[in-house]
């Protein structure tokens, strides 16, 4: 059994790594804590999440940039450059796959078995949904179908736990609804489902705004605004009858949604 001193040291190293923007080392430090098979504190949980978010985020950004350049080169007929870009994309995709698989192992083998609180259960299942979604962003064919299905199951498990354990205004429940709706819009190509989920979460939170915890007011209202922004973007993709059902949500140009991470 690892000592509390070791745990404290890993957490401190993770905080240092975050300040120094050395996110790979931040992840390693927090993985060491997770591997102790202890229930993480809110602070530890957030450190782990921030580390992985940055490690995967830089690769997702790289992938998007390279994909955009690839499209431009294809339109110009520069086959040699397209070939070079495809090879580079494969490298980034391999890194993304490894990072996402890595966090899945940590969640499934250490974090979920060690957690008792409903909030943590929602948090970890949401994380699984997010990282399978990141895989679905670049996978194709059956591989995409498989990770999309796993993402859906994780988001559904998180939603079931959230509805049982967390208030509609809780930032983790709202963040889950935000990311789950992005999954429907971007991965499942279902703007109707995305809008329904986002609007339902927004409306339920609005109805309980008076009971909003002062500590989480800023986080909750920020996510509610993101839900609203996405609804504004997405309603222009709906058929007219479905759009009417959104009860006056403003329309704007269609585009990808913002997610909580």
Swiss-Prot record:
Signal peptide: none annotated. One of its GO terms (biological process) is signal transduction. One of its GO terms (cellular component) is cytoplasm. InterPro entries: 14-3-3 (IPR000308), 14-3-3_CS (IPR023409), 14-3-3_dom_sf (IPR036815), 14-3-3_domain (IPR023410). Pfam families: 14-3-3. It comes from the Eukaryota. Residues 239-261 are annotated as: Disordered. Belongs to the 14-3-3 family. Homodimer. This is 14-3-3 protein 9. It comes from Solanum lycopersicum (Tomato). The gene is TFT9.
């Amino acid at each position: 059994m690892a000592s509390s001193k070791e745990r404290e040291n890993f957490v401190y190293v993770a905080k240092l790594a975050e300040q120094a923007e050395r996110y790979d080392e931040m992840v390693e430090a927090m993985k060491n804590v997770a591997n102790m098979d202890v229930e993480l504190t809110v602070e530890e949980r957030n450190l782990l999440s921030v580390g992985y978010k940055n490690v995967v985020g830089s690769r997702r950004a790289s992938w998007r940039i390279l994909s955009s350049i690839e499209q431009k080169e294809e339109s110009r007929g520069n086959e040699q450059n397209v070939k070079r870009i495809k090879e580079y994309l494969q490298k980034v995709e391999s890194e993304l796959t490894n990072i996402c698989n890595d966090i899945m192992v940590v969640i499934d083998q250490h974090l979920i078995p060690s957690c008792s609180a409903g909030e943590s259960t929602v948090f970890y299942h949401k994380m699984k949904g997010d990282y399978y979604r990141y895989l679905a962003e670049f996978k194709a064919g059956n591989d995409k179908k498989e990770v999309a299905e796993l993402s859906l199951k994780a988001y559904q498990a998180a939603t079931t736990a959230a509805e049982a354990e967390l208030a509609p205004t809780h930032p983790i429940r709202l963040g889950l609804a935000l990311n789950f709706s992005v999954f429907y819009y971007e991965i499942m190509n279902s703007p109707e489902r995305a809008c329904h989920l986002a609007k339902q979460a927004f409306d339920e939170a609005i109805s309980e705004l008076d009971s909003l915890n002062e500590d989480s007011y800023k986080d909750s209202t920020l996510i509610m605004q993101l839900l609203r922004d996405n609804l504004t973007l997405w309603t222009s993709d709906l058929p007219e009858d479905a759009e009417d059902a959104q009860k006056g949500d403003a329309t704007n140009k269609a585009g990808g949604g913002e997610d909580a991470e």
